[in-house]
Amino acid sequence: MTAGHGAQEWDSRYAGSDRVWSAAPNAWVAATLREWFTGRALDLGTGEGRHAVWLAALGWRVTAVDFSTVGIERGRAGAQDVGVEVDWVVSDVRTWEPTAGETFDLVLVAYLHLEDDVLARARTWLAPGGALVVVGHALRNLTEGVGGPQDARLLHTEAEYREASRGLVVEQLGEVVRHLPDGDAIDLALVARRPWGDQ
């Protein structure tokens, strides 16, 4: 999801092709989460649900949120194809809130580019020991990489990710380069964990 594009625009985009994104998870997401112990996961801005379905196949209990009805329907079909259960929620991540008292062992935010402070809200939904895992296009990608939003306000810096994870223990923060046929894309990745003793 990108700011400036509403649910109708994303519905049209998803309806216009077989898949907008790959059905496989992002390589960095897969490498980072593949060996983690499973629990409750939230995929915020799930799009067509590729990460939600992949996490569910690993054994996570997943809630996936996106404002695109078409994207959610694609995710639902993908989950059915591989025989996994996901709690699909059609809602705008800028206003969605979990049920009172509901927390997650993992909040995944992949390529969600908004001006709203979604990450700061997402960190409050972590269970003790839970992790906020974020990957998106880095600000440097605008001038030195390929793809992604062409609006600097929607791209991120390490300082912004650090601020968004205030109160969490940052385990990983830095750029990740994806080699694509038309050049390199520069992403920014974060893993930040709520301390176990934080009640």
Region locations from a protein language model:
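Conserved SAM/SAH-binding beta-strand->alpha-helix loop
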Residues: 68-70
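Conserved SAM-binding strand-loop segment of SAM-dependent methyltransferases
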Residues: 81-93
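A short acidic, Gly/Pro-enriched loop at the edge of an enzyme's catalytic core
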Residues: 98-106
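Conserved beta-strand signature within the Rossmann-like core of class I S-adenosyl-L-methionine
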Residues: 129-137
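Short alpha-helix
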Residues: 153-167, 173
